[in-house]
């Protein structure tokens, strides 16, 4: 099965040892536009296995970008590059963001990646896209600019030792801008005032479509970190009810995939089933469902949940939208890999 992975035929998704360089070469270098679930796994293994060789990571991921047209893979490459948070990766992301012919999901992720890397030089890059014709890119760049300005606010001092400044800022990024609980660089930097807000106030901000998007994002991540029934239900509700911003709903889906709370199941399935929803939201929902279904919980209740997730992902692995269909295959691969099982998709 090549190209669009949701055409006819069947495939068996099953465990394959991926923690080696041969797997990475097989699926990111030798394979083009097929076996998307293995390509995605190879992408994350590449980041880990070559973590001490950034030049090789750049070579492999650049090759993958140049030789694959899957929006899902290209988008995820941009995400991984941003999370690596190395200034050597700036040029790759700038090229993606500059390309107005590139899919907006990829451009969105490139802008987020530039903010995650945090270089002060990225501020002027991001400013150029604040009036982009794509609302998803505009909104992402607004958030990215806010994040970059916060991360670099100490870089404007007149100290003569610029290298020392850069090292201090880099350490601050590592210490303050990475989620300790989820080990990710979030797309917004929290303000201290947000720490004192009550749950009700955060939920109000989350649902208020009239406030700046950054404020809603701050509420989103604060509620994620609480990991309570109330906070997860609030996130699930806004995933379904929000009408203002696709990138916001996509981030809600991503966060629910991090939280791995069973209360999110009905909201995620409802969102995936909504074929009128933006593809970037449904794609993220499919991945979140895969994560939720890959837990090793030995209870009948969870087995029922897992069965429903597998059935749903199988159904939408044939979705008319390629990025959604591929994301469902990747979600199924999460389950197959983590639980060492085989899943047949007809």
From Swiss-Prot:
Name of this chain's protein: Deoxyhypusine hydroxylase
Gene: dohh
Binding site for Fe cation 1: 75, 283-284
Cofactor(s) required, per the database record: Fe(2+)
Key words, A-Z: Hypusine biosynthesis, Iron, Metal-binding, Monooxygenase, Oxidoreductase, Repeat
Function: Catalyzes the hydroxylation of the N(6)-(4-aminobutyl)-L-lysine intermediate produced by deoxyhypusine synthase/DHPS on a critical lysine of the eukaryotic translation initiation factor 5A/eIF-5A. This is the second step of the post-translational modification of that lysine into an unusual amino acid residue named hypusine. Hypusination is unique to mature eIF-5A factor and is essential for its function.
Extra remark beyond the main annotation: Inhibited by the drug zileuton in vitro.
Matches recorded under Pfam families: HEAT_2 (PF13646)
InterPro entries: ARM-like, ARM-type_fold, Deoxyhypusine_hydroxylase, PBS_lyase_HEAT
């Amino acid at each position: 099965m090549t190209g669009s992975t949701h055409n006819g035929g069947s495939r068996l998704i099953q465990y394959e040892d991926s923690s080696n360089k041969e797997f990475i070469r097989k699926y990111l270098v030798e394979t083009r536009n097929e076996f998307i679930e293995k390509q995605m796994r190879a992408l994350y293994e590449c980041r880990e296995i070559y973590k001490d060789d950034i030049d090789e990571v750049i070579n492999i991921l650049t090759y993958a970008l140049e030789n694959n047209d899957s929006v899902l893979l290209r988008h995820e490459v941009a995400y991984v590059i941003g999370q690596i948070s190395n200034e050597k990766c700036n040029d790759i992301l700038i090229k993606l963001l500059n390309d107005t012919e590139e899919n907006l999901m990829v451009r969105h992720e490139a802008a987020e990646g530039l903010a995650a890397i945090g270089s002060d030089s990225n501020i002027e890059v991001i400013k150029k896209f604040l009036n982009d014709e794509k609302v998803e890119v505009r909104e992402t760049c607004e958030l990215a600019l806010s994040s970059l300005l916060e991360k670099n606010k100490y870089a404007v001092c007149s100290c003569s030792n610029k290298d020392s400044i850069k090292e201090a800022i880099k350490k601050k990024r590592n210490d303050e801008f990475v989620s300790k609980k989820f080990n990710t660089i979030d797309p917004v930097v929290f303000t201290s005032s947000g720490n004192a807000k009550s749950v009700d106030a955060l939920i109000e901000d989350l649902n208020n479509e009239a406030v700046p998007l950054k404020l809603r994002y701050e509420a989103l991540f604060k509620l994620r970190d609480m990991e309570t029934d109330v906070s997860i239900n609030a996130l699930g509700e806004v995933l379904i009810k929000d009408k203002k911003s696709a990138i916001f709903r996509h981030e809600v889906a991503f966060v629910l995939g991090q939280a791995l709370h069973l209360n999110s199941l009905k909201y995620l399935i409802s969102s995936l089933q909504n074929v009128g929803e933006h593809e970037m939201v449904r794609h993220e929902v499919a991945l979140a469902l895969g994560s939720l279904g890959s837990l090793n919980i030995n209870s009948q209740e969870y087995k029922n949940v897992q069965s429903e997730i597998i059935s749903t992902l199988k159904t939408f692995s044939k979705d008319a939208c390629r990025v959604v269909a591929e994301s469902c295959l990747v979600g199924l691969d999460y389950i197959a890999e983590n639980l060492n099982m085989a899943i047949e998709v007809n």
